[in-house]
Amino acid sequence: MMPPPFMPPPGLPPPFPPMGLPPMSQRPPAIPPMPPGILPPMLPPMGAPPPLTQIPGMVPPMMPGMLMPAVPVTAATAPGADTASSAVAGTGPPRALWSEHVAPDGRIYYYNADDKQSVWEKPSVLKSKAELLLSQCPWKEYKSDTGKPYYYNNQSQESRWTRPKDLDDLEALVKQESAGKQQTQQLQTLQPQPPQPQPDPPPIPPGPIPVPMALLEPEPGRSEDCDVLEAAQPLEQGFLQREEGPSSSTGQHRQPQEEEEAKPEPERSGLSWSNREKAKQAFKELLRDKAVPSNASWEQAMKMVVTDPRYSALPKLSEKKQAFNAYKAQREKEEKEEARLRAKEAKQTLQHFLEQHERMTSTTRYRRAEQTFGDLEVWAVVPERERKEVYDDVLFFLAKKEKEQAKQLRRRNIQALKSILDGMSSVNFQTTWSQAQQYLMDNPSFAQDQQLQNMDKEDALICFEEHIRALEREEEEERERARLRERRQQRKNREAFQSFLDELHETGQLHSMSTWMELYPAVSTDVRFANMLGQPGSTPLDLFKFYVEELKARFHDEKKIIKDILKDRGFCVEVNTAFEDFAHVISFDKRAAALDAGNIKLTFNSLLEKAEARETEREKEEARRMRRREAAFRSMLRQAVPALELGTAWEEVRERFVCDSAFEQITLESERIRLFREFLQVLEQTECQHLHTKGRKHGRKGKKHHRKRSHSPSGSESDEEELPPPSLRPPKRRRRNPSESGSEPSSSLDSVESGGAALGGPGSPSSHLLLGSDHGLRKTKKPKKKTKKRRHKSTSPDSETDPEDKAGKESEDREQEQDREPRQAELPNRSPGFGIKKEKTGWDTSESELSEGELERRRRTLLQQLDDHQ
């Protein structure tokens, strides 16, 4: 089935008319009412050849009450089907089966006498080689809704508004062949030749071939009256002839042919044509040669061409009229095209004339132009309506032209003024506009240029501002370059001073422990130091500090290197090691060449401090071991059975303790004697205190005793079990006056310790209680010991964070805790009531009537408890 010619390619909207009707611009004129006695057109009888208006596959274009169909080709009439069938069969249909006809609207169609089908498109068997190439071209022409032609490629599915070059070449080839055929036909009309057999048509490409819209759409400019008259005459004649003929289909078909043959024909001059197409073309050429107008009637045309021999080219009158109608349609198109071209040429001439005339400007009025150019033929030949359109276009063109000229003049003036300002050396970035105007008036180039003097003041001021800004940018760039040069010189000065510090470090004058005051005499005499003075940024002192800090930052890494060197050499820093020996050992290693002298000294100080700390810790450990041995010796004396008495000599009891381990730990005999005498002194002080406190304030102690027993936590026990013996009670504590000197606590503590020694030594029960009661005083003395340790702290960087020092401090703290445990273990042995009352009053409230045996029993019980805790 042939595709509808009005279908656009993909991507464009189809130009479908509203409500299924053809477009208004393509609607054929309505048929006037039929005259009386004329019947409406009817279908021809079966079996007869179709008349002109009833070709199979076509709707009569002039049937009353109906409109011209947009697509008069059915599926059976598709040329692609014929082409495909012929291609499959292998043999194309002969040329004689196809005949060319002209529809009433002037369009050419083709009729197949074999299958009684009509098509709009020219069959492939009738096409020339150029036409076949044109049909195979992928580019096809279509029309949009507005009537503007566009071109579509079936293969690449591309649409464009411009005409492809391939399509132009093929159409030029087709026109060339058609022109050659026309010349051949003219020669044949003048010199008739015998008919020659037509060659077989070229092969037809498979597939449907789209028909361009221009071949199927009627000419919109054609007059309605001419179409009606041309279509009505053959219709009326055909219908009248059918009515008068016999009822049989054969008679109705043959009667018009006999009548046409019976009409008188002019004498033939003996000219002959090879086929009907050439004869029809010769008849049209006759009408064209005689200049038959498109509005001429048949009778007028006959008068003009009847005497020509070519008039007899078509034997039948119907064929002549059909060719005449086709010629009129074609001639009408040509006349309209010629008129359109003449009007277009006249408009172009007028437009060119107005655009080039010197009196025309963009502000000229139409009335003024009509008064000026009204007498000229170029003005009068164009209609007024089109003339106004041309005039508006000219005004638009002139306005655009004047605007462009103004822009060019403005650019020219600005460029000229810039050139003048650039050449004036008196203008700098501080020049004002009034000064610049005076300089310009004195400049000969500006004074001689009239266009430059008529320049817009605002444009001149803008140009001057841009010039001044350019000068300011140049000045700023020059200043920036000067600043960069100055900064570069300052940087070079700093680098030179840095290299000077490197030289001092290489010579050993500068190290991590150097100070600015030490090096200033050597630094100030150098020229590199003098170049640094007065410039911003880092000062020589800052660079010196940065350099020293950098050397100090290398301390930890260099310290590791020094330790590795000492480890490889097997050298250890002791308390009595000299720095010269330390430096002498390090100097033998190659790695010491890159070490800083100050860091070497700091490392030696750090190692020396660690050695001193180790020695101090060793001494403390030895003292702690000695104290533990003395405590064990005193405990051995306390636990002696029978107990030691006052007045006992060391030689008498020495043999009793020879086999004891505590005796063996004290290696010096003098120490043993000293500890034994201290023990006897403590024992003696305890006995004396017991004798002096028996008869002191008995009544008042009783009241306090009853009060204390009522508040005692262990109320079920007796007073005798809760309170310690009177001999173990400490003396009354005297309230200290704040105005007294700070040395009194230490003196009181010494007196207590001496008193404890008088009471029988540290091994006696009273001495332990005194130690327990004075626990708070001992705690107050511990911070003083810590302050003494802090005196040995060094200012070296690793003195605070050295892990060996931390380990030493931790071990010292652990030993202090171990030394504090025996003292704290004595506190729970005291009764709660005794401790609380002692803290509140400081007086002993036990009974004085206890016997000496009871006191001895309690003393032994306390000693036993102390031994158990130890």
Swiss-Prot record:
Residue spans of biased composition, Pro residues class: 192-211
Under the heading PANTHER family, the entry gives: PRE-MRNA-PROCESSING FACTOR 40 HOMOLOG B (PTHR11864:SF1), PRE-MRNA-PROCESSING PROTEIN PRP40 (PTHR11864)
Which residue intervals define the domain WW in the entry? 92-125, 133-166
Q: Which PROSITE patterns match?
A: FF, WW_DOMAIN_1, WW_DOMAIN_2
Q: PTM Phosphoserine: at which residues?
A: S764, S831, S851
Coiled-coil spans are 604-640
Assembly, in brief, is:
Interacts with the N-terminus of HD.
**Which is a Gene Ontology cellular component entry for this protein?**
nuclear speck
Q: Which residues carry this modification: N6-acetyllysine?
A: K148
Q: Which keywords appear in this protein's UniProt record, sorted alphabetically?
A: Acetylation, Coiled coil, Isopeptide bond, mRNA processing, mRNA splicing, Nucleus, Phosphoprotein, Repeat, Ubl conjugation
Q: What is this protein called?
A: Pre-mRNA-processing factor 40 homolog B
